[in-house]
Amino acid sequence: MRGTARRIGGTALATVVLSAGLAACTDGKGESARSCTGGTYAWSDVRRSEELTELADPIRLEKRTASYSAHLRPVGDTGVRPTVNGTPHGVRAADVIKALGKHLRVGEPLADPSDRDVPEEGLGHVFEAATGDLKGAYYSWAYRKAVEADFAYTCGSNAPVKGHVRTWEETGTGFLPCSSGPSELMTGRQAARESCPEGSEATEAS
């Protein structure tokens, strides 16, 4: 019902070499426009957060049912794409994000600028549950596990270029009964407080 979390370790500051060969530099219009690829990244201030992106209206099933579909409406800062501020000249934003993923040793690629956290602007996912025995109060939500970091890119004789990356490692959805204990996910507990009846087990402090 929800995505598989990945635990990723990494030091606060590290250098990733993108190419074993010499950096390739091309003169542009002056030193400030000098293009250089194959440089190194020094990463710092890596931060992770879990963010609620979509939430279903409170779900109340008076009679037992075999399946249920919940429309998730976007909440908070959604419809966003990964961003890179301060992209080095001659380097794509996707390459910077890929370098961050290499530094973090992620199992799956980080989201790149072509990805978005909801299907379309203003529209959410539809979550379907088919357990065969649904009754009572439920809650459903979607989340993203965001990651952001500062970097300094050094290449050839160019001055270091400093920038900032914001992307995400994972997105997922959940559907749980309000009568169960609190969700393992912070966003699940937040969703339960928004959707479940007061006093439900799912809203208790974990």
Task: Please give the residue ranges for each predicted region.
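Secretory targeting and sorting signals
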Residues: 1-28
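Small/flexible residues
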Residues: 4, 8-9, 62-66, 75, ...
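Hydrophobic alpha-helical membrane segments, chiefly transmembrane helices and signal peptide h-regions
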Residues: 14-23, 95-107, 142-146
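Core pore-forming/fusogenic effector modules of secreted, proteolytically activated toxins
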Residues: 26-76, 114-206
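Membrane-inserting effector segments that mediate pore formation, membrane fusion
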Residues: 70-123
